């Protein structure tokens, strides 16, 4: 008596193989879609968090600009707000900002904000340079602390506008011909455009960014977010 051996025919094997291949391909495709979507969410969350945190700190420092301690051991603070328009050397003409304020009778602070390029790259970040003078006696005030740091990564544009009490732009504002205009500044507007670190779109996307007096187009696979804050410089108003 012969036993019947059960098995799969060649056609059945081929059908099973095809179905398995399709299933694996479908799972791989679904994973890619999910992964790209997840990475996009992570990138956007990172941009939003870094932008909000940076603007919060920047706003606090702008509120201090121009504060003069009446017992300051250095010469009275007369130059405290400076801006350079459309700094060259970048993809986009960004601004550069410098502020001063007294921290105590013995201490004075200077902070510079401007775009810088990463090494061997055209991409830019917003840098923050911090200088801290500490006086040991009258007019003997060496820099005790100096910090140059990456304030926000992947910043494409940084724009500053100074407004007077009628809402009109004040310019120039610097330590030369625009020195007298420091007193006219009643609000400081900051525009900051941050780009994602990685590409997140499958196809290029058109962008048109409008920040203060700066407008520029982009066509790529990155996402972006622009942040804005308007600050009341209370110490300038009191000067």
Labelled PLM ranges:
Residues 42-43, 140, 216:
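Residue-level detector of alpha-helix boundaries and kinks
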Residues 71, 94, 132-134, 232-239:
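Short amphipathic alpha-helical segments
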Residues 2-69:
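Aliphatic-rich helix starts adjacent to a transmembrane/signal segment
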Residues 77-166, 187, 224, 228:
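Surface-exposed loop/linker segments characteristic of extracytoplasmic
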């Amino acid at each position: 008596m012969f036993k019947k051996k059960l098995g799969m025919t060649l056609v059945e094997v081929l059908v099973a193989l095809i179905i398995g291949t399709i299933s694996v391909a479908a799972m791989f495709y679904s994973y890619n879609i999910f992964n790209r979507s997840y990475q996009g969410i992570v990138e956007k969350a990172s941009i939003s968090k870094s932008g909000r945190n940076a603007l919060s700190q920047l706003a606090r420092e702008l509120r201090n600009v121009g504060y003069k301690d009446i017992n300051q051991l250095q010469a009275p603070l007369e130059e405290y707000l400076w801006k350079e328009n459309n700094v060259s050397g970048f993809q986009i003409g960004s601004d550069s900002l410098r502020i001063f304020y007294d921290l105590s009778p013995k201490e004075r602070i200077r902070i510079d904000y401007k775009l810088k390029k990463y090494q061997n790259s055209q991409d830019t970040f917003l840098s923050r340079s911090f200088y801290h003078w500490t006086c040991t006696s009258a007019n003997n005030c060496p820099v005790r602390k100096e910090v140059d740091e990456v304030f926000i990564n992947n910043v494409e544009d940084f724009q500053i506008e100074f407004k007077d009490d009628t809402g009109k732009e004040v310019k120039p504002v610097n330590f030369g011909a625009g020195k007298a205009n420091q007193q006219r500044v009643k609000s400081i507007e900051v525009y900051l455009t941050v780009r994602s670190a990685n590409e997140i779109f499958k196809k290029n996307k058109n962008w048109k960014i409008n920040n203060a007096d700066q407008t520029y187009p982009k066509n790529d696979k990155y996402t972006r977010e622009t942040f804005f804050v308007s600050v009341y410089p209370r110490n300038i108003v009191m000067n």
